[in-house]
Amino acid sequence: MINPNPKRSDEPVFWGLFGAGGMWGAIIAPVIVLLVGIMLPLGLFPGDALSFERVLTFAQSFIGRVFLFLMIVLPLWCGLHRMHHAMHDLKIHVPAGKWVFYGLAAILTVVTAIGVITL
């Protein structure tokens, strides 16, 4: 018999954030590390393409704030989701693990939002 009131799961929301964070961490983050962490210190950029003033102006623009927010938050959700499931796979039972890991991710998301808004 089909249950007319199936139990809804919140897992798709967390899987969506995990997937978005994984894709961001695989595609966007390595490019930023290459540009800012390797090429910039070696002086491989023309002139002041990434001068402090230009980077600060970008970071204080709307699109820059959104980019910084996503650059921090999406990999954060991915990592904490991975840690939550790794603890389960290793049979290390964290009391209220879903609340601990996803709650920490939510708190850090709010902290990041406040930090990016006040930049």
Curated annotation (Swiss-Prot):
Membrane topology: Multi-pass membrane protein
Statement: the UniProt record of this protein carries the keyword Cell inner membrane: yes
Any Pfam family matching the protein: Fumarate_red_D
Superkingdom classification of source: Bacteria
Biological-process GO terms, alphabetical: fumarate metabolic process
Location (main, coarse): membrane
Keyword Electron transport tagged: no
Protein keywords: Cell inner membrane, Cell membrane, Membrane, Transmembrane, Transmembrane helix
SUPFAM superfamilies: Fumarate reductase respiratory complex transmembrane subunits
CDD domains reported in the protein's UniProt record: QFR_TypeD_subunitD
Bilayer-crossing regions: 25-45, 61-81, 99-119
Any Gene Ontology CC annotation: fumarate reductase complex
Gene Ontology MF annotations: succinate dehydrogenase activity
Subunit structure: Part of an enzyme complex containing four subunits: a flavoprotein (FrdA), an iron-sulfur protein (FrdB), and two hydrophobic anchor proteins (FrdC and FrdD).
Family assignment from sequence similarity: Belongs to the FrdD family.
Known role: Two distinct, membrane-bound, FAD-containing enzymes are responsible for the catalysis of fumarate and succinate interconversion; fumarate reductase is used in anaerobic growth, and succinate dehydrogenase is used in aerobic growth. Anchors the catalytic components of the fumarate reductase complex to the cell inner membrane, binds quinones.
This protein's name: Fumarate reductase subunit D
